[in-house]
Amino acid sequence: MPRRPLLEFEKPLVELEQQIEQIRQRARDSEVDVSPQLHQLETLAARRREEIFKSLTPAQKIQVARHPHRPSTLDYIQMLCDDWVELHGDRRGSDDQALIGGIGRLGDRAVLLIGHQKGRDTKENVARNFGMATPGGYRKALRLMDHANRFGLPILSFIDTPGAYAGLLAEEQGQGEAIAVNLREMFRFRVPIIATVIGEGGSGGALGIGVADKLLMFEHSVYTVASPEACASILWRDAGKASEAASALKITGPDLLSLGVVDEVLPEPVGGNHWAPLEAGEILKEALTRNLEGLLQLSEDALREQRYRKFRAMGQFLDDLSPEALMAE
């Protein structure tokens, strides 16, 4: 088994991981039965990892969300769907590789799947622009969502981006307009939409495919108006205060659930989704199937009205009203 990169706060596990690897190597090189010793060390490592991950700070959760081995949109699509056909292009000369989409089947139901896609290494990250979509990417997503709306396909989106690409060319090509049009049109769609934050959900880049009837996020994912580094640079002119900004921004699942921004926080395997991708895929599949079945019971008008009220309730503050009460108004 290839060794996974350990995060800074996992360093107390380094010695245990080294011992486990040495025992595995010994087992490969000889016929000595080391399974009892190996089981004991693996159990100890799992227990210590569970203790560490139960008390992560927001800044540490960001590290987990950005882990290079964390499952990506394509990884989840392959786990969710037996059949998957990727669709390309925005029909305006662009086929952004940072935002992908296509048709697949969740169980026996045809669905549209779209999402940000990061790379596994430097070369792939450059090709995918580190998951930062250009205007062409958001226009491609809109074209595919229009297709889904026309043919009655539920839309499943997967959010994993530090933000929309903010380069000069992206601004010249209308980045703000592309995202704004997506927001407007997603409110009008007559089909169920479920968005899931699988890694980091940053700013307008996340919102561009994030207007949904149900917004889910994994336990160690983050969803934020701006990255903590950017926030610290803007407020304090010091990116070194990113950890302080992360706590103030309320970017974690429990905080966002209490604020009414997300609808469900999905548990992760001990150590994060990168430690057990298949288990993470099963958790996601169950949540998507369950939420989709509920949404399919609603009429088109009820879907759109509920979606509108959900987002109108965000950002309002009244002493005597909870987010649930605001949505009921």
From Swiss-Prot:
EC number(s) per entry: 2.1.3.15
Reaction(s) this enzyme catalyzes, per UniProt: N(6)-carboxybiotinyl-L-lysyl-[protein] + acetyl-CoA = N(6)-biotinyl-L-lysyl-[protein] + malonyl-CoA
Keyword terms, alphabetized: ATP-binding, Cytoplasm, Fatty acid biosynthesis, Fatty acid metabolism, Lipid biosynthesis, Lipid metabolism, Nucleotide-binding, Transferase
Any GO BP annotation: fatty acid biosynthetic process
Entry GO MF terms: acetyl-CoA carboxylase activity; ATP binding; carboxyl- or carbamoyltransferase activity
Keyword Nucleotide-binding annotated: yes
Major location (coarse): cytoplasm
Cellular component terms (Gene Ontology): acetyl-CoA carboxylase complex
Residue stretches making up the CoA carboxyltransferase C-terminal domain: 40-294
Pfam families registered for this protein in UniProt: ACCA (PF03255)
Pathway(s) per entry: Lipid metabolism; malonyl-CoA biosynthesis; malonyl-CoA from acetyl-CoA: step 1/1
SUPFAM superfamilies, per the entry: ClpP/crotonase
Localization: Cytoplasm
Main EC class the enzyme belongs to: transferase
HAMAP family listed in its UniProt record: AcetylCoA_CT_alpha
Function: Component of the acetyl coenzyme A carboxylase (ACC) complex. First, biotin carboxylase catalyzes the carboxylation of biotin on its carrier protein (BCCP) and then the CO(2) group is transferred by the carboxyltransferase to acetyl-CoA to form malonyl-CoA.
Subunit structure: Acetyl-CoA carboxylase is a heterohexamer composed of biotin carboxyl carrier protein (AccB), biotin carboxylase (AccC) and two subunits each of ACCase subunit alpha (AccA) and ACCase subunit beta (AccD).
Family: Belongs to the AccA family.
Protein name in the entry: Acetyl-coenzyme A carboxylase carboxyl transferase subunit alpha
